[in-house]
């Protein structure tokens, strides 16, 4: 078992322009303060204010956006981190675990990971993800690349179709097709931080947002030992080399996770479970009284003194006792949130410490709040009620379907760029406008400069005479379109779709 020494994990070095050495605790703190500044001031964080949490295109400022949700996650993450450090101090383990001079960076890395955890999410949340993946699956047919005769391959892209006698190229084609059909917000977050925004964060800070450890091109069965850690794609083929270096710098075995990521994940789970229900009441999907009844019915029979009684019933009774009846809803959610935090945060901290050997190594194959405890049951209660009463509400489903259509429609609109030959697209990139390609020229001009530069840089690194050049160029071209559309805010995507479909 590896010795627990966080000095080997909280790596303050960066990929580029890293200080040659640090001499004091203050030097290390300054490095992580620089990370904070880069993150807080990044456009990716600002765009979260117009991205969906639960209710797309919401005009009511009291309802959460991705940004306000992320700020709440940041605060809960800070709370858990402080609780962990406080308990380790009581146990006199800070020095033994190499944390005595790293408490500030420990908290900061968790906080900033919490703030960043949703930056890769596309417009309209999970329905935006589904729209991107469905659109590419219909055209690339990744399943056809796995087993049946090559003649049955339905892939529409010539450069990605399988060919007899090209074993190594076919293996790469399979990877590329699977990768492009596995868009995921967490993987896009890694791409944003490193490839698109070039934030040059410390290795520890980036490691903390690598929530899932499965490569997006993975098509084999997931190992049972890492079934939870690899349940979703965590990074793309484009970032394979960077993630390999990240693992080396953080001393992580393949498919293992950075220790502080478990805290970020727990903070997210705690934050959204209550917030989604509060937003539903704000939207008048149900009243606070109806919500209490939903929670009561879903929990079932219980004894006085149970966790439900201490958290939910206590919040309800205190809010009813308030003489200002018009603020009873606000009072209920204030008490519910406080009661929930006071139970789940210490429990998450205790789970982190109790499982620290596996967490430090990176192969603890569970979430901190995923077990058979009452705390886990309370979290599941909130999630199940939200799933049944909020996400299945007709108004929410209609907005999600509209979001799915918007993203699918935008991909249709930009498809001419993906249908160009390699020669034509290369000419368009070089000249930016080509007279004989009027539609493609106008579409290319609409792509952001940052995304176009990322494409150009990636393609320029390829050997043009290599057999895989055409398929890898097409891969980066698809990434270009995915980067652009996934980087839109909900409102921008909605307006862009309406403009280009000529419906206004």
From Swiss-Prot:
GO process annotations (BP): dGTP catabolic process
Cofactor: Mg(2+)
Gene that produces this protein: dgt
Protein name: Deoxyguanosinetriphosphate triphosphohydrolase
Entry annotated with the keyword Ribosomal protein: no
Enzyme class: hydrolase
Provenance organism: Klebsiella pneumoniae subsp. pneumoniae (strain ATCC 700721 / MGH 78578)
Reactions listed under catalytic activity: dGTP + H2O = 2'-deoxyguanosine + triphosphate + H(+)
Taxonomic lineage: Bacteria, Pseudomonadati, Pseudomonadota, Gammaproteobacteria, Enterobacterales
Cross-referenced Pfam families: HD, HD_assoc
């Amino acid at each position: 078992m590896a010795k627990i020494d966080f000095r080997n994990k909280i790596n303050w070095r960066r990929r580029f322009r890293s200080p040659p050495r640090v001499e004091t605790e203050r030097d290390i703190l300054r490095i992580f303060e620089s990370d904070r500044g880069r993150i807080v001031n990044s456009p990716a964080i600002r765009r979260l204010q117009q991205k969906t949490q639960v209710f797309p295109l919401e005009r009511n400022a009291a309802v959460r956006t991705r940004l306000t949700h992320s700020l709440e996650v940041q605060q809960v993450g800070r709370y858990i981190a402080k609780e962990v450090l406080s308990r380790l101090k009581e146990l006199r383990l800070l020095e033994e675990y190499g944390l005595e001079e790293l408490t500030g960076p420990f908290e900061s890395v968790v906080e900033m990971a919490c703030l960043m955890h949703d930056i890769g999410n596309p417009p309209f949340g999970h329905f935006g993800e589904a729209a991107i993946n469905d659109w590419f699956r219909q055209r690339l047919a990744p399943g056809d690349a796995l087993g049946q005769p090559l003649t049955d391959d339905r892939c529409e892209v010539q450069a990605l179709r399988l060919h007899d006698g090209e074993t190594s190229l076919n293996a790469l084609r399979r990877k590329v097709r699977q990768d492009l059909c596995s868009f995921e917000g967490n993987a896009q977050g890694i791409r944003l931080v490193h490839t698109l925004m070039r934030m040059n964060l410390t290795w520890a800070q980036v490691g903390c947002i690598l929530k899932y450890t499965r490569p997006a091109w993975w098509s084999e069965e997931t190992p049972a030992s890492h079934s939870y850690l690899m349940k979703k794609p965590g990074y793309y083929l484009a970032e394979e080399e960077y993630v390999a270096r990240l693992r080396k710098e953080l001393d992580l075995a393949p498919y293992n996770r950075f220790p502080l990521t478990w805290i970020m994940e727990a903070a997210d789970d705690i934050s959204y479970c209550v917030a989604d229900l509060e937003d539903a009441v704000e939207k008048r999907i149900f009243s606070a009284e109806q919500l209490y009844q939903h929670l009561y019915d879903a929990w079932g029979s219980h004894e006085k003194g149970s966790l439900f009684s201490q958290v939910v019933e206590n919040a309800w009774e205190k809010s009813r006792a308030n003489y200002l009846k018009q603020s009873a809803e606000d009072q209920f959610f204030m008490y519910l949130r406080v009661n929930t935090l006071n139970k789940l945060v210490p429990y998450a901290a205790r789970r982190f410490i109790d499982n620290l050997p596996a967490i430090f190594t990176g192969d603890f194959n569970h979430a901190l709040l995923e077990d058979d405890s009452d705390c886990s049951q309370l979290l599941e209660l909130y999630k199940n009620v939200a799933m049944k009463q909020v996400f299945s509400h007709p108004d929410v489903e209609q907005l999600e379907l509209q979001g799915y259509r918007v993203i699918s429609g935008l991909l249709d609109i930009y498809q001419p760029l993906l249908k160009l030959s390699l020669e034509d697209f290369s000419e368009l990139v070089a000249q930016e406008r080509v007279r004989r390609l009027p539609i493609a020229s106008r579409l290319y001009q609409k792509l952001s400069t940052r995304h176009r530069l990322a494409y150009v840089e990636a393609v320029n690194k390829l050997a043009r005479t290599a057999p895989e050049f055409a398929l890898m160029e097409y891969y980066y071209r698809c990434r270009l379109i995915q980067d652009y559309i996934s980087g839109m805010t909900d409102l921008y995507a909605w307006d862009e779709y309406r403009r280009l479909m000529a419906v206004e």
